[in-house]
Amino acid sequence: FKTVLSELQNKSEEIEIIDLYRCSFARPRDQLVESFKKLIIWSENIYIISPVWWFRLTPRTETFFDEVFTPGFAYKFINITKTYAYPKPFLKDKKVRTYITHGSPSLPVLTLYLNSVKLRLVMGVYTFVFGWRLSLFTKSRQCWSVPFVSEAKRKKYLESVKRDIKKDIIK
C-alpha cells in the first residue's frame, strides 16, 4: 500500500483511499456504500490491495464487492433466453490493478488449486463489473510467501509495483 501511495503522490495524482478496515461496517451502511460508489464513479484508476485468507480476499474486501459492485450500479444482466443471461458491465472505462499477497508459496496455489484465488476474482467479479479484457488478468499481481521472503525478494516485489504504477499513470 505504501509503495502504491508514494508512487501516485510522486506523480501528483489525485488520490482517494478507501481503507475497509477503518470503515464501520455496522448496519445500516447505505451511506457508506453510497460514498464508495461515488468514489468508484469518480476514479479513473482503481487499486485493490488485499491479502488472501482461506483462498479468497479478506471478508471486508469481499463485502465491498458484494455491496458496492451491485446489479444496476456496476452491471446488469442481459437476457439471451428465459433462463440464461450475461452481465453487461457499467464500469468498463475504469483501469483496475490488484495486488494480492499470499502467505503460501506459488507452487501449490498455481498447480493443486489451479490459481483459484485469481481466477475467481477476475472471472467471477471483475469481468461482470469491468468487462472482458486481458488486462484484468495481467494487472492482477500475486506476491507469494510474503511473510517468509527475503528482504531482497520483498524489494523485488515493491520494484515491480513501482514499475506498474509508472505504466498506469502515463497518459
Residue ranges with predicted function:
Residues E16-I18, Y47, R97-I100, F137-R141:
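Hydrophobic/aromatic beta-strand patches that form the interior of the parallel beta-sheet core
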Residues P108-K171:
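Glycine-rich phosphate/pyrophosphate-binding loop and the adjoining helix
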Residues F77-F128:
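Short, glycine-/small-residue-rich phosphate/pyrophosphate-handling segment
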Residues V33-K38, D93-T98, L134:
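Short hydrophobic/aromatic-rich motifs at helix boundaries and adjacent loops
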